[in-house]
């Protein structure tokens, strides 16, 4: 026998499917939603549907946007010669918060993971390598988290870009941050320093 009405049990189950949300947190959220004004609930549902309907990866870099090209790719004042490679759009936000980076980005949409069967073709890698062949791209900064999968992905990209057909400098952000940490949890100063102190690999 369930402790909750069927509709509430379904809500708790669906909320607990979200990353970092356990069943206990999902239960709290469910009770909060029940107590919310119906109009606010409708607005929440509309926002979720709107995001799923209108938000998509940028056709150029993979960052999330509601247009064909994201605002960063469309900004003519940004430095086209430098591309920083990150795992996801949350990492873009983290770097942008430093207020010190003026280049472009490339969002992979994940990391290589043999354990989870995530292979190169499952990530936004092909478009990265196409961008790196363009004459105006001079440097690729690898800003992936210092985790096992992050290192695996970084090393894969380095090996590909070592090929003579790619005339770009490749560098990696300094590792003055805890191993295993995700970039989104770095404070702005640490992240800025990590980019500033990046080391050249190729």
UniProtKB/Swiss-Prot annotation:
InterPro entries: DNA_Rcmb_RecR (IPR000093), Rcmb_RecR (IPR023627), Rcmb_RecR_Znf (IPR015967), TOPRIM_dom (IPR006171), TOPRIM_RecR (IPR034137). Residues 81-178 form the Toprim domain. GO terms for biological process: DNA recombination; DNA repair. Keywords: DNA damage, DNA recombination, DNA repair, Metal-binding, Zinc, Zinc-finger. The keyword Ribosomal protein does not apply. It comes from the Bacteria. The keyword Iron does not apply. A zinc finger (C4-type) spans 58-73. GO terms for molecular function: DNA binding; zinc ion binding. PROSITE patterns: RECR, TOPRIM. PANTHER family: RECOMBINATION PROTEIN RECR. May play a role in DNA repair. It seems to be involved in an RecBC-independent recombinational process of DNA repair. It may act with RecF and RecO. Belongs to the RecR family. This is Recombination protein RecR. It comes from Finegoldia magna (strain ATCC 29328 / DSM 20472 / WAL 2508). The gene is recR.
